[in-house]
Amino acid sequence: MTNISLKKINKSKVYQYIYRKKTTSKLQIVQELQMGLSTVSQNLNLLEQEGLIEKNGFFESTGGRKANALQIVSDFKISIGIGILKGMFHITAVDLYGNAFYTDTIPLPYSNTPDYYKQVTDAVKEFISSRQYDNDKVLGISIATQGITSPDHTTVLYGDIMNNAGMKLDDFSRYLPYPCYLEHDSKSAAFLELWNHPELDSAVVFLLNRNLGGAIITNHQIHQGCSMHSGTIEHICVNPDGPLCYCGNRGCLETYCSANSLEQASGMTIKEFFPLLREKKSPQLIQIWEDYLKHLAFAMKNLNLVIDAPVSYTHLRAHETLSDL
């Protein structure tokens, strides 16, 4: 191993240690990594000069000089997420810890036209320029949409909710000078679960948005299936004679356990539904909610028997949907 390689390894070890600890001191690094004080000091100076770390206050004194509190610069690099929905899109920017530090929702009905994709990507570029970020600061952009993608994540193959079959990654990436990735919104939610819970080996993920969605995690990976349909729990049939689903079948879990199903059954919006439900004055609303919970629990129990893994529920910017859960 060359001296240059060793220096790079030591520098990386120091940075990764600070990243994991979130806040630490020079002495803690020396002790934990068993490096010499001069080696640690040299690497801290390099990392600070490169803008990768910063001093942020002091630790309490134990009798001598107060030690600097060292942290990474969490937005040294950022990633951006775009959530495409039927009547709007969301933009979220996250730092190196995955913390969202910027979110915005922009009303814009989806249409498979160049003008639509230009408006979405212009909003992303406007955010980046407003923060005066250089292009190399952006690690990449992930686009989540309601639709099953091709195995290479370049095209939406099935998208009845938004009528977006044929949407292509290139529709966005041609306007954006960053690496881009296209994914089903439910599987994007599962990626978030893996990020927040790296110890998670397997799980069934329920995405409680306006439409129900789901994903399967096995062996720390999102299970895609042979035709990318794995995890589409919203189309499990719970009643062959039940309500008609947008997929053309009857009695799908979607028709019982989505915000849309609650609105259709109650004849009111979600914003109206939950406050009235909490008043406990309407037997009809209580029954609708109990039916929702009963079908959701039924699906969770059966999927747990198949996968034998924890069941998780989440939502992605679920405005006016089930964030009240």
Language-model features: where?
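Glycine/GP-enriched mid-protein hinge/lid loop-to-helix segment characteristic of carbohydrate kinases
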Residues: 103, 177-283
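Glycine-rich phosphate-binding loop and adjoining helix at the ATP-binding site
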Residues: 104-202, 323
